[in-house]
Amino acid sequence: MLEDICSQHKKLESQKDIEIILVDNNSFDNTAEVVYRFVENTELSIKYFTEKKLGLSACRNFAVTKASGDLLAFIHDDINLDEDWLKEAYQLALGCHDQEIGVFGGRSVPMWQEDFPDWLNLQRPYGVRQEVFNGHSFGDEEKYYPFDTEYGTAEFPSGLNVFIRKEIFENCGNFRTDLGPSAAGGFSMLDDYEFFEYLSMLKIPMVYVPQCIVYHPVSPSKMTIQNIRRWYFKHGRAQYWVAHTDRMKRDPHPLLGINPKFRKIIPTFAKQKFKGVPIFLHLKFFFLTVEWLIQHFSLNSARRHWLSFKISETMGEIEASALVNEQVNSRKFSFRDRLIKKGITADFN
């Protein structure tokens, strides 16, 4: 990737005001040796740092403190750049868009290293979400985030390929370090989604820029049923956690996966909890499982697989809801203990 950036940099009419920041997340290989060897043979401004706190979010936040530019580009180390990526990124930095826009979300296209399995379906209505394969491709036209997708979800930029003005971090905060790959909190995704959804709540303009393209390799191991189920489980787990904690905490019992238009008709009892888990999630798991069993007698394998993925996602939500309930109870008893120490008593039941 460094070679690609160096090659594209030489083609720019102006080669100033570009720096590369590499953050080594406490690796034990020869990463530092490779980087220093590359730095000696290029005119690019490359800064190399080590962040001991594990997690992609921690690395991003650390990189922000070391960056001197006004527009920061974030990409992963396992992607391939489109031949015009740096040129298009430089156009963003030059201010070819409204200066009020705080975030530009680029396109990420999966690079399939093997033909699709016969069972794998990417099309509606029972298609696997492209995010499973690190895809973020929504047409050739620029448009403002968030926008609705074919999956019925609100879409935000992907951390695989995104450009953020540095002042955003100064004014709005950083990525949550309990989310994302290798995060201490154990929630290995939605670190970028949570951050951009939060910016959307703050009315920060964000635009999808499809001309800034990266390609993400997809190995055969990523295209297995087990891996996709694992992805949906982690997604459901992180989705519920994000909705109930920290700066994104909303309705204490959101009906995740249900269109807001229909949430009002859900019976009140379904929003209550049974053993720390909303009854709605118990019901959701039950009915999905029943339908999945029925589909075993059907020839519609795409729907059967889709149902198994949704069951995995619901199981993740159930696990996260139990963790949230545990956290709430812990805070409740901690508050009670503080009152008791002060000689104040109350009925907490």
Question: Where is each model-derived feature located?
Answer:
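Short, well-formed alpha-helical segments that are part of the catalytic scaffolds
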Residues: 1-10
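Short aromatic/hydrophobic "clamp" motif used to bind/position activated sugar donors
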Residues: 72
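Conserved donor NDP-sugar-binding/catalytic core segment of glycosyltransferases
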Residues: 84-125
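Active-site-adjacent helix/loop segment of glycosyltransferases
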Residues: 206, 210-305
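Short, flexible, basic/aromatic active-site loop/helix in glycosyltransferases
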Residues: 124-154
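A conserved acidic beta->alpha catalytic loop
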Residues: 24-33, 79
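Glycine-rich, basic loop-to-helix element that forms the pyrophosphate-binding segment
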Residues: 51-67
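Acidic donor-binding loop at a coil-to-helix junction in glycosyltransferase catalytic cores
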Residues: 157-159, 181-195
